[in-house]
Design a protein with these regions (language model features):
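Short acidic-hydrophobic, aromatic-tinged amphipathic segments that line or gate anion-handling sites
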Residues: 128-138
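A short, well-ordered alpha-helical element
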Residues: 47-69
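Amphipathic alpha-helical interaction surfaces in cytosolic regulatory modules
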Residues: 75-122
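Conserved beta-strand segments of the P-loop GTPase G domain that flank and frequently precede/overlap
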Residues: 39-42, 70-74, 110
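Non-catalytic signal-transmission and effector/linker regions of two-component phosphorelay proteins
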Residues: 146-153
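STAS-typified acidic loop motif
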Residues: 27-55
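Long, leucine- and charge-enriched amphipathic alpha-helices
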Residues: 1-27
Length: 153
């Protein structure tokens, strides 16, 4: 095998690893609440990653009967936002929100740190999504609006 062939093989392997990492850093998890998904976003945030996460969520919504999408930013702090100004981050999050809304699904954002919230507010971006402090609070809210209760058996 010559040098060019070897480079192509390595480039393909890198693409495969990047795809695997992207899947692991924003898995789509079905919730105990019917028609609800949880998407924990972890790792460094870049515009390209947010676009891929948005596409992944929209494809999942298209293929499944989803009413609520809980996007969990617990792992994301201002220092985990790479090469992207906070205005751009706000725009990407707004695009995610608008896209989910256009699919007929209600987005919920949870786990935003006070620092991240402050930066989004200062950027002037208006988010059209309900927010909760954490995943548990969002689940309690969804259980209430869906008249669901947990019972011991």
């Amino acid at each position: 095998m010559n040098k060019d062939e070897y480079i192509k093989i390595l480039e393909k392997r890198v693409e495969e690893y990047e795809a695997a990492i992207a899947d692991m850093t924003a898995p789509i998890i079905p919730s105990i609440i019917p028609q609800t998904i949880l998407v924990p976003v972890t790792g460094l945030l870049m515009a390209e990653r947010l676009e891929k996460i948005t596409a992944k969520i929209l494809n999942h919504i298209k293929e499944h009967d989803i009413e609520f999408a809980i996007i969990d930013f617990t792992d994301i702090t201002v220092d985990r936002i790479e090469q992207m100004c906070l205005t751009e981050l706000g725009e990407q999050i707004r695009n995610l929100t608008d896209s989910i809304n256009l699919m007929g699904v209600k987005p919920y954002f949870v786990g935003m740190t006070p620092q991240l919230i402050k930066e989004i507010v200062l950027s002037g971006i208006e988010l059209n999504a309900e927010t909760h402090a954490n995943f548990q609070a969002a689940l309690k809210h969804l259980m209430k609006i869906n008249s669901l209760v947990f019972r011991k058996i």
